[in-house]
Amino acid sequence: MSRTCQITRKKPMNGNKRSHAMNATKRWFIPNIHSHRFWIENKKKFIKLRISTKGIRLVDKLGIEQFLSIVSFKNKKNY
């Protein structure tokens, strides 16, 4: 499964872990992805998304219908 948020498009990025002596060691910064079910009122069913915690907060604030239109539009553009 992909480690990409379906709403915010966050994905893993790499960087350096720094020790006290400032030695650099490569590491991955992985987004906080959860599987979450959302209730779609007009379709009367749940949908399941792999979404970051920031994406969950955005959906709670603005509504799931707005984000579904964005995701379907981006999927048509060969995401």
Swiss-Prot record:
Provide the alphabetized UniProt keywords. Ribonucleoprotein, Ribosomal protein
A cellular component term, taken from the record's GO annotations: ribosome
Q: Does the keyword Ribonucleoprotein apply?
A: yes
Q: Which GO terms describe its biological process?
A: translation
State the superkingdom.
Bacteria
GO function term, MF aspect, one: structural constituent of ribosome
Q: Which family does it belong to?
A: Belongs to the bacterial ribosomal protein bL28 family.
In Swiss-Prot or TrEMBL terms, this protein is called: Large ribosomal subunit protein bL28
Please name the source species: Blochmanniella floridana
The UniProt gene name for this protein comes to rpmB
